[in-house]
Amino acid sequence: DWMMEDIFAKLYDMTAFSNIIADPSFLIMYAIAFILLYLGIRKHYEPLLLVPIAFGVLIANFPGGDMGVIQADENGMVMVNGVLKNIWEMPLHEIAHDLGLMNFIYYMLIKTGFLPPVIFMGVGALTDFGPMLRNLRLSIFGAAAQLGIFTVLLCAVMMGFTPQEAGALGIIGGADGPTAIFTTIKLAPHLLGPIAIAAYSYMALVPVIIPLVVKLLCSKKELMINMKEQEKLYPSKTEIKNLRVLKIIFPIAVTTIVALFVPTAVPLIGMLMFGNLIKEIGSDTSRLFDAAANSIMNAATIFLGLSVGATMTSEAFLNWTTIGIVVGGFLAFALSISGGIFFVKLFNLFSKKKINPLIGATGLSAVPMASRVCNEIATKYDPKNHVLNYCMSSNISGVIGSAVAAGVLISFLG
């Protein structure tokens, strides 16, 4: 009956149980995956992002499944079947064959920096710059929220991260997944997994984080400032005559200006504005718009989500660096929100026309999530006080702001 025992031993080896019992840290990763799935499915927090990421985390952590992304070290060296190889010198078919599907997607589409700008094109196609152009003076608060990025950068350097790692860590404060990924690839590729997870998780947790920070920093009286009444009391002098023409000129002008001043931000801003331009031109480019906003955007999101999730293997994730990144990312996030709020408070000290501090809190680029959350807070205190359109203007300028901040970091530290 040794035959039977042999067969059972073989069957047991085939399963993942032996490895999981030998290394229970996998169980922590399953727990993280299930929490993220719960947030995405039951709580409806950014399901389009959280569900693919969480599922990526889940499938990456079954030993023997070969779906985890293998992290190359700083010099690009990885273990392939017991041999050290340089990942950048391996042909793609070899990566696919030896390291599996996820590594193929990851090294081809993400590490090369291909997907983030493509997703930005989709974001541009789905963004309406109208609210921002109508309230241009509010868009300055989108710039103020980038303070969190630079504050955390300084703190991280003091804590012993290299300037490059610190820059990648700080960009989490921009609350923008593709920007965080793009910056990290350029500055600290070995930290891509945890930084991407932190950026996307905090983006998804915007409905929890913004109210926390707002409760701490704003009085009820400030939250009840009604922007519409302020408009009536102090009407603005400038009136936009031809919004449609302006909306077409805007993406072209922004790209040109940003490209002249921060050329490293062009891959992100250029694609964002191109996506927006084909939307605003209208029927002549409607087919391009349709592709950018739907099929391309959706396919890119699937590949990005799954492979970013798959970078979260237990050995890559359960260490002090990662925990530092998760904590630092939270700080960057909270500081970005409070930076925007303080900027509004400062503005209100000197201006007759008051601004609701919630408009500072939406300087993050989690669009339109942050604006929706702030609108809910405002209507809770005063059901007639709708701030959505005003929030959108600082929210959307936050997208441009974080991409420009990324460009600045890349050119200084890269």
Language model features with spans:
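Membrane-embedded hairpin module used as a gating/binding unit in multi-pass transport
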Residues: S201-S283
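Juxtamembrane and boundary regions of transmembrane helices in multi-pass small-molecule transporters
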Residues: L154-P163, I195-E229, G339-K352, S397-G414
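Transmembrane helical segments that form the transport core of multi-pass membrane transport proteins
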Residues: A253-G340
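Alpha-helical membrane segments and immediately flanking helix-loop junctions
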Residues: M108-T112, F120-L126, I140-T151, F161-L191, ...
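Entry/N-cap segments of selected transmembrane alpha helices
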Residues: F129-L153, T313-G340, C391, N395
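Alpha-helical transmembrane segments
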Residues: H190-V208, G328-S336, I359-T362
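Hydrophobic transmembrane alpha-helices of secondary-active transporters
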Residues: L36, Y106-L133, G275-I278, M297-N319
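N-terminal alpha-helical transmembrane segments of multi-pass membrane transport
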Residues: W2-V78, G82, H97
